Swiss-Prot record:
The protein's name in its UniProt record: Ribose-5-phosphate isomerase A
Pathway: Carbohydrate degradation; pentose phosphate pathway; D-ribose 5-phosphate from D-ribulose 5-phosphate (non-oxidative stage): step 1/1
GO molecular function: identical protein binding; protein homodimerization activity; ribose-5-phosphate isomerase activity
Keyword Nucleotide-binding: no
Family to which this protein belongs: Belongs to the ribose 5-phosphate isomerase family.
Keyword Isomerase among record annotations: yes
Organism: Escherichia coli (strain K12)
Active site annotation, chain numbering: 103
GO BP, sorted A to Z: D-ribose metabolic process; pentose-phosphate shunt, non-oxidative branch
Catalytic activity reported: aldehydo-D-ribose 5-phosphate = D-ribulose 5-phosphate
Keywords: Isomerase
Cysteines paired by S-S bonds: none
InterPro entries: NagB/RpiA_transferase-like, Ribose5P_isomerase_typA_subgr, Ribose5P_isomerase_type_A
Length: 219
């Protein structure tokens, strides 16, 4: 199976967690896009979705799914999203698609976070994938200096502005042995909006696409 076929398999597998009559939290990226396609088959059974990016919002609306602003919603049963890396503790690096802040906000509200990914995203230690950090533009250089002190090599993601109007620093060369401590340390830097480490709030369920089928891991 190709990588895209594995992504499609987990996107459709996540449909089993969608309860009729609910509002579904939806992530961003190529794997989440397959979940949105699958969700389109249930558009008459769900109330709608909360989206983590403008791109996902457009796709949801194109399929006839009502998109709620998060401020209109009291609670979310599930949030379904991909990951750039996921470890054995269900902690993740996310933000390759630059939607990390909205993704983290929606994940924090959801009762259950379902991570959908192909097997290539599984790692023992997080950090080989460059760690995205969303930063207020005026603080870019100041934040970069602090990230160097934490052992990373920050690189400005040229030409990218987040949906919130901020910039992204991708931090290379990190071997993140204590993801919770690293998440807290980076989030404490003035000017950081959020870091793409999902360690304090990791996934509850991981659906991993393998050539032998979809593997389910429960926290």
């Amino acid at each position: 199976m190709t990588q895209d076929e594995l992504k499609k398999a987990v996107g459709w597998a996540a449909l089993q967690y969608v309860q009729p009559g609910t509002i579904v939290g939806v992530g961003t990226g190529s794997t989440a896009a397959h979940f949105i396609d699958a969700l389109g088959t249930m558009k008459g059974q769900i109330e709608g979705a909360v989206s983590s990016s403008d791109a996902s919002t457009e796709k949801l609306k194109s399929l006839g799914i009502h998109v709620f602003d998060l401020n209109e919603v009291d609670s979310l049963g599930i949030y379904v999203d991909g990951a750039d890396e996921i470890n054995g503790h269900m902690q993740m690096i996310k933000g390759g698609g630059a939607a990390l802040t909205r993704e983290k906000i929606i994940a924090s509200v959801a009762e259950k976070f379902i991570c959908i990914a192909d097997a290539s995203k599984q790692v023992d230690i997080l950090g080989k994938f460059p760690l995205p950090v969303e930063v207020i533009p005026m603080a870019r250089s100041a934040v970069a200096r602090q990230l160097v002190k934490l052992g990373g090599r920050p690189e400005y993601r040229q030409g990218v502005v987040t949906d919130n109007g901020n910039v992204i620093l991708d931090v290379h060369g990190m071997e993140i042995l204590d993801p919770i401590a690293m998440e807290n340390a980076i989030n404490a830097i003035p000017g950081v909006v959020t870091v793409g480490l999902f360690a304090n709030r990791g996934a509850d369920v991981a659906l991993i696409g393998t050539p032998d089928g979809v593997k389910t891991i429960v926290k």
